[in-house]
UniProtKB/Swiss-Prot annotation:
The keyword Electron transport does not apply. It is a peripheral membrane protein. This is ATP synthase subunit alpha. Transmembrane segments: none annotated. The keyword Ion transport applies. GO terms for molecular function: ADP binding; ATP binding; proton-transporting ATP synthase activity, rotational mechanism. The record marks 374 as: Required for activity. It comes from Psychrobacter cryohalolentis (strain ATCC BAA-1226 / DSM 17306 / VKM B-2378 / K5). Keywords: ATP synthesis, ATP-binding, Cell inner membrane, Cell membrane, CF(1), Hydrogen ion transport, Ion transport, Membrane, Nucleotide-binding, Translocase, Transport. Pfam families: ATP-synt_ab, ATP-synt_ab_C, ATP-synt_ab_N.
Amino acid sequence: MQQLNPAEISNLIKQRIQDLDAGATAKNEGTIVKVSDGIVQIHGLEDAMYGEMIEFEGEVYGMALNLERDSVGAVVLGDFLKLQEGQKAYCTGRILEVPVGPELLGRVVDALGNPIDGKGPINAKMTDKVEKIAPGVIDRQSVDQPVMTGYKSVDTMIPIGRGQRELIIGDRQTGKTAMAIDAIIAQKSSGIKCVYVAIGQKRSTIANVVRKLEQTGALEYTTVVVASASEPAALQYIAPYSGCTMGEYFRDRGEDALIVFDDLSKQAVAYRQISLLLRRPPGREAYPGDVFYLHSRLLERASRVNAAYVEKFTNGEVVGKTGSLTALPIIETQAGDVSAFVPTNVISITDGQIFLESSLFNSGIRPAVNAGISVSRVGGAAQTKIIKKLSGGIRTALAQYRELAAFAQFASDLDDVTREQLDHGERVTELMKQKQYQPMSISEQAAVIYASNEGFLADVPVEKIGSFEEAYLRYMHDEQADLMKEIDDTANYNDDIAGRLKSSLETFKQNHSY
């Protein structure tokens, strides 16, 4: 009888185990127990993480938001009508990610980064997490470089710096989106990459915005992220974070980016809807208790990071460059009520706000910026030298004008100084008006503000200020192109530039009509 060698048997078993190819990968599995309004309750999935992607049958995905003792509450990122009770759900082990990189520039994508512009697939080489921790205090650098919006009223009185969060707030139909789109168009020569996130808007409105960006050549350096009004609340909630991740790609590699959230009021409403469906306890205005955190964790990701952070992030590939992500969140108020829950939250998170007023808009002052309560908390350090030097007179003139205009209604006889201040204020108000889609360069702004400060508009009738400005800038581009280029290139202000501006104004007023 043959003797069995235990060592041989042991080796044979070990060899068989090593050669075994386990075809099925182990997945944490659960069962759908309830489906309603885009929310799924799943029994099981003990290992699910907060924010993890959950896979359902039929290639539908969800995101885990409620981790309870014996079940998981998830929002469906897509068509929840395909799902039924009793179907299986699987953990993926992955937090939600979106494609990032320069391949997304010039494209229109949904909240998950899928192209929706009919221009074919996006062959992005990288993906990144939608939810990320904002850079720490040590990794940041103070804001000291400007983002020119092309608006005289903003760049002079409420300047924005790279890495700043500047809120645009106002009622519906006051020009909030127009201001943000103009800011994107104005970045044509600045090298700043842009991301426009449309949340809860009509598709026709978004199509108009995309068309305008295309016509002005701004789409080539812009990514448009869309979560329209017809899409599930879950996608409207995620879209701003997805857009932020796309913008952070450039920030972390030593480049500058600008992101517009249009608008965060609708994101808060979508999050409220999700929270109530998940049976979370409601608070003030039925918003959940963490609605402040919803916006703070998003807007804290907009920052200016120092060269050490960029060098470490790129493993030494990019040296000596700082990166920035500037945010322009938009909030819609109801009847000018800035003391409502979401507006006060976002005002306290951001580094300043541009307040647009219906009454100014309807009286023809556009952009309808209320200079009194609009403020930029950090932008002053980022202003260019020439604009900083010249803009002091603008804010003073407007403040005095608003104060005196109230008294002038009742007083019949005004002294000469008061009348002079009223006349000057009226002209400055007229000068601050600007047409849509016509952003102005540094040199153009400097030229017209200098004219106002030095009293060259005093004898120009108020109704002719607009035509004077147009004719004067045309003259400057034709006759003083070198001066305009020098101001644009250096942004410096000295006696030589002031003298040349003065003589060009004198020549223009003598020899040209307007």
